[in-house]
């Protein structure tokens, strides 16, 4: 696929061949730059397509997008919730190739996205946080503390209950790597969610317990 065809696909509504643009983008620096900027575009269709392709491409070759670190880091402070979501997820994908340890200077600020004014932003932040957990063992204690701090956020109670399903999914991915002390904290958190007001969270907590032999 040539660059012109890839560009045409990215502006289409729900194109069936969207992910066929990934390889051309990985091979073409100009297309990559356009994709990154497109992920912050005003046009919803174009932005949505760019974001989907961006994360597929970053998963395959994150190093190709490391030069755009600053653009993504700026995104987490954008007044636009969609931009904050993109920035949060992109930084997580780049953590494994962060040779200049740029994450260090913004990490505490980054973790505050769990308390974002938009629940959507917190959801996507949580969705990719395990990528940082695996890439940066030195940040693991802070990540666990962050995951267990949701009740301290400003989210309305109903939204907190929804987000706890995301947190349980995170904890499921990292549970076997936790210290005994942190496992006890997590188990206590999971047991509390069996009484959650969210059916999804209750179900997720129950499945977590069965998987990890808690009951």
Where are these regions (language model features)?
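Hydrophobic, well-structured mid-protein blocks that either form specific transmembrane helices
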Residues: 77-128
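Extended alpha-helical scaffolding segments
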Residues: 132, 149-204, 208
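N-terminal alpha-helical scaffold/docking segments in eukaryotic complex subunits
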Residues: 1-60, 171, 175, 187, ...
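Hydrophobic residues within the alpha-helices of tandem HEAT/HEAT-like
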Residues: 52-59, 87-97, 128-135, 166-176, ...
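Conserved hydrophobic register position within alpha-solenoid helical repeats
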Residues: 21, 50, 87, 125, ...
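Short inter-helical turns and helix N-cap capping residues of alpha-solenoid HEAT/ARM repeat scaffolds
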Residues: 42-44, 79-81, 117-119, 155-160, ...
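Amphipathic alpha-helical scaffolding segments comprising HEAT/armadillo-like alpha-solenoid repeats
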Residues: 2-4, 26-39, 62-75, 100-113, ...
């Amino acid at each position: 696929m040539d660059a012109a065809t890839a560009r045409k696909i990215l502006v289409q509504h729900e194109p069936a061949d969207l992910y066929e643009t990934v390889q051309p983008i990985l091979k073409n620096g100009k297309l990559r730059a356009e994709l990154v900027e497109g992920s912050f575009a005003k046009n919803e269709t174009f932005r949505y397509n760019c974001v989907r392709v961006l994360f597929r491409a970053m998963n395959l070759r994150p190093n190709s997008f490391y030069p755009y670190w600053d653009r993504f880091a700026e995104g987490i402070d954008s007044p636009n919730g969609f931009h904050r979501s993109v920035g949060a997820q992109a930084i997580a994908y780049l953590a494994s190739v962060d040779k200049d340890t740029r994450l260090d200077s913004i990490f505490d600020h980054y973790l505050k996205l769990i308390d974002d004014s938009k629940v959507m932003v917190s959801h996507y932040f949580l969705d990719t946080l395990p990528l940082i957990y695996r890439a940066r063992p030195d940040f693991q204690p802070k990540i666990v503390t962050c995951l267990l701090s949701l009740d301290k956020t400003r989210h309305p109670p109903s939204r907190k209950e929804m987000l706890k399903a995301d947190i349980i999914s995170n904890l499921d991915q990292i549970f076997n790597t936790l210290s005994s002390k942190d496992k006890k904290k997590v188990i206590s958190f999971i047991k509390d969610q069996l009484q959650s007001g969210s059916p999804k969270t209750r179900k997720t907590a129950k499945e977590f317990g069965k998987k990890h032999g808690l009951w």
